[in-house]
Amino acid sequence: MLMPKRVKYRKTQRGRMKGNAGRGTDVSFGSFGLKAIEPAWITSRQIEAARVAMNRYMKRDGKIWIRIFPDKPVSKKAAETRMGSGKGAPEFWVAVVKPGRIMFEADGVSKEIATEAFRLAAKKLPIKTRFIVRPDYEG
């Protein structure tokens, strides 16, 4: 699972996901990308499941880039705990994804293979996504 090696603060406030992504909206490493259309928290397990799905379909061909990183801890109180007595312990890590963000990129495979790999990866994610091709791609 992806998670930071160390953080300044163990627990964070939940915050809100307003507006569109300001950066990370262009395909910059590969030729194909998977773009988020809805805002969401993507957990490290979901990122890993999507990565495994893409790798299994693409086999040894091509390269995959993960453009999001789960750097936000989400805390949770134990089951059947009374209110109060502080905030719960960090339970899992999430990446805050806003609309327009490129989450995954791929290169070194045909457009058909990349489309199918991203389709399988999108099934593992809790949001609507769109397949993006780099503007200067010729294939």
Curated annotation (Swiss-Prot):
Stated family: Belongs to the universal ribosomal protein uL16 family.
Protein name, entry field: Large ribosomal subunit protein uL16
Cellular component terms (Gene Ontology): cytosolic large ribosomal subunit
One term of GO molecular function: structural constituent of ribosome
Gene Ontology BP, a term: translation
Quaternary structure and partners: Part of the 50S ribosomal subunit.
The entry's keywords: Ribonucleoprotein, Ribosomal protein, RNA-binding, rRNA-binding, tRNA-binding
Known role: Binds 23S rRNA and is also seen to make contacts with the A and possibly P site tRNAs.
Xref: PANTHER family: 50S/60S RIBOSOMAL PROTEIN L16, LARGE RIBOSOMAL SUBUNIT PROTEIN UL16M
Pfam families cross-referenced by the UniProt entry: Ribosomal_L16
InterPro entries per the UniProt record, alphabetical: Ribosomal_uL16, Ribosomal_uL16_bact-type, Ribosomal_uL16_CS, Ribosomal_uL16_dom, Ribosomal_uL16_sf
HAMAP family found in the cross-reference section: Ribosomal_uL16
Presence of the UniProt keyword Ribonucleoprotein in the record: yes
Gene: rplP
